[in-house]
Each structure stands twice: as C-alpha cells, then as structure tokens.
Amino acid sequence: MSKLGKKIGFIGTGQMGEAILRGFLAAELFQADDIYVMDILDSRLQYLKENFKITHLSSDKNKAYSYIVDNCDIVVLSIKPQVLKEVLEYIKDCNWNREKHMIISIIGGINTSFIEKYLPEIPVVRVIPNTPMLVNIGASGVAPGRSASKEHAKLVHGMFEALGVSYLVEEKHIDSITAISGCGPAYVYMMIEAMADGGVELGLPREMAQTLAAQTVMGGAKMVLNTDEHPGRLKDKVCSPGGSTIAGVRALEQGAFRGTIMKAIEAGKVRMEEVAKEEENNN
C-alpha cells in the first residue's frame, strides 16, 4: 500500500501524465501495484508495464473507466481537452462516492467547473504541473474546485510538493502559473540552445557548449532560489565596469530580451484563456 494509503488511477498517460506517475513512484508516494492506468494505446500500456512494472492496465473504454473508479481513491485526468467531454460522458455513470473519491485534473485550459457539471458532488482539484517533474524539480500550481475541501487541497498540494515546489492558489491564478512554469521550460530550453549555438560559433564543441550553457542556467537558478538577493542584484555582481558581461547585457537589451520574455508569458496566458473559451463554446 502507498504512503498515502490510497490507490490512484490515470486516465491517459501522455508525457505529463508519465512525468507525474514517474515522480510519484520515485517519491514512493505510490507503489506500482497502487497504480491503475487507462490509455487507448496498447503500445503505451506495454511501455508502462515494462518500465514501471504496472500491471493494472486497460485500453477498453467500456470496462477501464469503471475498473479505475471501482478500485481507486484518486483519479487523474491526463488527457487532451478535445476528448474530455467524451471521457466525462463515460465516467459520469460510474460508481462514484463523494466520501472516497477525488479527481485531479491536469488538463490545460479546463476549469474545475466544467468537470463538476458532470460530477457535481465529487471533489475536483486542478493542477498545472511541468515536465521537469521527470527529474523531481517540478513546479506546480494547485487549485481546489467548488466541491473540494481544504483537506483535499492539502493532500494534492503535498503530493506535488514531493515532485518539486507546489503553490496552493485560487483557480483564477492557474492560467498565470501555466504561462510561467508550464510554458517556461520551453523558453529555458530555447535559451540553452541559443547559448550553445553561440559557443559553437565561437569554436567550442557542441557537447561542451551545451553542457556549459545548461549548467550555467541551473547554477543561476539555484543562486536565485538559495540566496535572498534579487535577480537584478545578482546580475549586477557579474557585470564588471567595461567588461564582457555588461557588453552582452547591452546586446540583450538592444534585442528587447526582457520585454520579449514578458510578452511570451502574456501570450501563454492569453492562449490558455482562449482554449477555455473554445472548449466552453464547443460543449
């Protein structure tokens, strides 16, 4: 039995679902026998069986949903927004019990209220995780729905805190969190790639340049997290008068580096809001 004394079922196991599943196993929150998975791809189920020793697996829509609800306390919705309505139509008539069950939704752009229309009495907690959970350095936002209690929210918050950092927030802040920590890893990867490309242009081997870039980003992040100093102050400490760093900073400012990053964060939030409206209009 898991540390939490509960069993968990995943409906869908894409990249993010796998990251969470892998993280829960690594943190020993659940054992393989505590985990149930429904995925439409048999190849995906075989992968989970071979790599994580999970045996409670099914791709049969007519049986798998009831199987998960009957056996699990926590049900994780890890599917595309486009198929959510179909899944909810399947699972709404399963044997749900408000005192036993809780739903965790990691579906981008879908508010808890949408799920609650189909399962009005079942606690729903929305979570926005990110892919660095694969290496236990994730960052998550956790927002309880209308039917979720403080205890439900605290439980989910603790589960995701085991995979990195987790913030318990009101749902109105979830899209903003998504724009930073959900989308942000892609921007960081782009920066690492660009730094490595710059090193290659200057004559460094690709592997060396990429490792130096990634290590530098990781080191800078740890400096921000482990000191009480503002990032701007830390930047100033690297910039010697008339030196190479301040010359590079000037080049970044000429390219509107900070403003562009802020625009990317804003664009991510706007797109999340658009997705929510699209799904609402379609349903």
Predicted regions and their residues:
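Conserved short alpha-helix immediately C-terminal to the canonical SAM/SAH-binding motif I
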Residues: 41-44, 83, 195
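Small-residue helix-packing motif on alpha-helices
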Residues: 35, 45, 68, 205-212, ...
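Internal alpha-helical scaffold of NAD(P)-dependent oxidoreductase catalytic cores
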Residues: 114, 118-123, 139-177, 189-226, ...
